[in-house]
Curated annotation (Swiss-Prot):
This is Small ribosomal subunit protein eS19. Keywords: Ribonucleoprotein, Ribosomal protein. SUPFAM superfamilies: Winged helix' DNA-binding domain (SSF46785). Part of the 30S ribosomal subunit.
Length: 148
């Protein structure tokens, strides 16, 4: 059985983002105007960044769960350019992460527990099915990888 651990993260996240877009995951009206954290200077360049972030959060919860908003904020943070002063690490936007988690909960892919958010059995099978599709695509491109 193919799992999330068996395929490259970038291809899995891209494919998951496409599937989430097909599932009509909710998109807040402010996504076109916000930065993804204090450490960023501009908004994301990609128009579908919301779906990519939701897919990335879903993958992180699958791998590291149970996980809370604070840990995810740290994962999506970065160094802030402060001019002449030394750079410091700043956490990512908590509002973006909270809203993404709420949308994933509405779809039934993630649920709240006292320890943090975890992937539901539906979410686990959703990601495993996508991982199988990604693995099949990779094997079609490079047949030598079929033995792995």
């Amino acid at each position: 059985m193919v799992t999330v651990y068996d395929v490259p993260a970038d291809k899995l996240i891209q494919k998951t983002a496409e599937k989430l877009k097909e599932m009509n995951i909710g998109v807040p009206e402010w996504v076109d105007f916000v930065k993804t954290g204090v450490s960023r200077e501009r908004r994301p360049d990609q128009d579908d960044w919301w779906y990519i972030r939701c897919a990335s959060i879903l993958r992180k919860i699958y791998i590291y769960g149970p996980v809370g908003v604070s840990r995810l904020r740290t994962a999506y943070g970065g160094r802030k350019n402060r001019g002449h002063e030394p750079e410091h690490f700043y956490k990512g936007s908590g509002n973006i992460i909270r809203k993404a988690l709420q949308e994933l909960e509405k779809l039934g892919l993630v649920e709240k527990t006292p320890e943090g958010r975890v992937v539901t059995p539906k979410g686990r099978s959703f990601l495993d099915n996508i991982a199988k599709e990604v693995r099949d695509e990779i094997i079609n491109e490079i047949p030598a990888l079929a033995k792995y």
